[in-house]
Every structure is written in C-alpha cells, then in structure tokens.
C-alpha cells in the first residue's frame, strides 16, 4: 500500500522533534561509527571505526519503504533502524522504526528502557496509549490517531498501539536512543528463561496456577 506523499512531512517533523532532546550522552567528536573491531576506541558501548575509513554507507539505510510482514500472532511488524543497522548512529542518541499493522493487529504492551518515543501515524487508524507509574496511580493516557496525528510515549512507560481500522496501518516513530531496547510485557513475564515460579505469578496476577502454567507454555517459558 502506497504511503500518501502529503503525510511524509509530518513523519519528518516528528522524527526531527525526537532529535532535539536525545537521551544518550552527547558525543565529543564529529562521529563514532560503530565497529566490531576490539582494537578500536570504546565509546558509548561500541568501538569506533577509524575516522579516516568512515564513508557515506556508514550513515545510510535503505528499506523503510518496504512493508513488514504482519502475518504473526500479534498482527504487526516493527522494522528497526538503530545503531545495528546504521553504525553511524553510535553516540547520536537517536533511532527510528517503521511499524506495520494488519487490520486489528497490535503492537502489544511494552516498554523502552532507554528512550522516549514519538510516533506519527501515516496511514490507517490506531488506538494508542501508555500507563503511568504506580506513583501516579497507573493512569491511562490514550487517544485514537488518524493520519498525520502524533503521540508521545515517555521513557520507561508501558505503552501499546492497536489498529482499530479495517485496513492496514503504517506508523513511523523516533526514539531518543541509538538503541532504546524493548521489553514486551507478556513475553517477559510469562516467557522468561528460566520460568518464574508459577505460584508467584498466580498470586501477583490473581490467577490459578494452572492458568499461569498454560500462559508460560504459550509464551515458551516451559
């Protein structure tokens, strides 16, 4: 499905805004292109490529125009562009993703432990939101987004997106880290390795222990 050209500026603006207050430490040199050479200089968790050997391909990625495969259990696909895809992002404190959603597909509740997120919807209709911390009484902040709408997910907050439309949806998001990380709640709690004691989860979630074991089996923990 072709993305409307009129919405591209919205996506660009949203991503630029995410650059303004990057979460990662600021660089002290022009760039530090990540490399797996153990003889390099170690900066921000990665080794730096010799600046004399850096070229344009170290700052380039191609493929965000390609829809992700949403034929899976949650009906969504995240195409990530972080320091692993563009080594020149090392120390820059930014990254981005493309998210494709099948009709009624979702990006299930998850957190990014190292970065905030700003999302712009390009196509479709999404129900999105995040839940604040215990200190803030776990308030839900949610909106229905239409093409051109933007929503922010604060760092560390559990958040989600659900395609409530009858057609596929497409969104782009900027993150304030070169590698914001992701913790999907259900996979983490019920799919940990080794598994968390079922009795603990049963009491925490007010469930029968057998139900917990079924969930752990579903998510691959046992």
UniProtKB/Swiss-Prot annotation:
Residues 1-22 form the signal peptide. Mn(2+) binds at residues 110, 112, 117, 159. Residues 62-213 form the Cupin type-1 domain. It holds the Pfam family Cupin_1. Keywords: Apoplast, Disulfide bond, Glycoprotein, Manganese, Metal-binding, Secreted, Signal. Gene3D superfamilies: Jelly Rolls (2.60.120.10). Its main location: secreted. Glycans are attached at residue 77. GO terms for molecular function: manganese ion binding. It is found in: Secreted, Extracellular space, Apoplast. May play a role in plant defense. Probably has no oxalate oxidase activity even if the active site is conserved. Oligomer (believed to be a pentamer but probably hexamer). This is Germin-like protein subfamily 1 member 16. It comes from Arabidopsis thaliana. The lineage of its organism: Eukaryota, Viridiplantae, Streptophyta, Embryophyta, Tracheophyta.
